[in-house]
Amino acid sequence: MTCTGVGLHSGAPVSLRIRPANAGAGIVFHRTDLDGFAIEASGRNVARVSYATSLMKKGVLISTTEHLLSAFTGVGIDNAIVELDNLELPILDGSARPFVEMIQKAGIRKQRKARTYLRIVREIELREGDKFIAVYPADAYSVSYSINFPHPLIGKQSFCVRLTNGSYLKEIAPARTFGFLHEADAMRQQGLIRGASIENAIVLNRDEVLNPPLRFPDEFVRHKVLDLIGDLALLGKQILGSVVADRAGHAMHTALVSRILRDRSYWEETALEDEPAMPALASAASLSV
């Protein structure tokens, strides 16, 4: 599978190709512009978490990983090789839907290895001021997220989803990233959102959306759920647990990942009896963007 686009923050053109990987390989990024240097999609490689999640290994950076990793989780892909020829993944339309469509077009097959999960066995709660994130033991993966923005079209929003029966594809994948016009100049001076446009983000001025319509009335909080799912993919396995977040962001998402990986007493590895094999990409496909 291949696609081309621009990085949300760098504004740099990038080509991305996704290939099948062996069972147990996990998700691995390869910088083809740097002789295929490999960076594993792991919480141990998290480097930057300001407005996006970035991974770094031996000084080599991969930026804005969350949308693709979220799509992988949403369709159940555990193993893939992701090749890109620049430092930042393409933003495409600002959601995970284009990635999901690419994967669906390629097809998914079962691999000859039992799929295992990371089952939460002990609650974890993290707080930072008015920000909060936690995960509690549960038999399935669910997310409950709340946000509060001082904007008349956002305000307080909450959304809950259980990641079963295609809920991700319908309820989460289409939700786009968003930003505020009055913050754009300052962010660009910081080297951010140089690739942002009304084609790849919801853009708001002080009282309206500049590129309507919204895909959901609460698209803003749904996108936060999308980001969280992508960041939690850095655990290396899909979790069985109930995640609750309030005004969190990439920094808190990845802090939770680090806490889980650091202390084995919070989780156990388990397989489900009715899911005997790992899903993987079946073939290659392409998407023009």
Predicted regions and their residues:
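C-terminal regulatory domains involved in ligand/effector binding and gene-expression control
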Residues: M1-D78, E83-V289
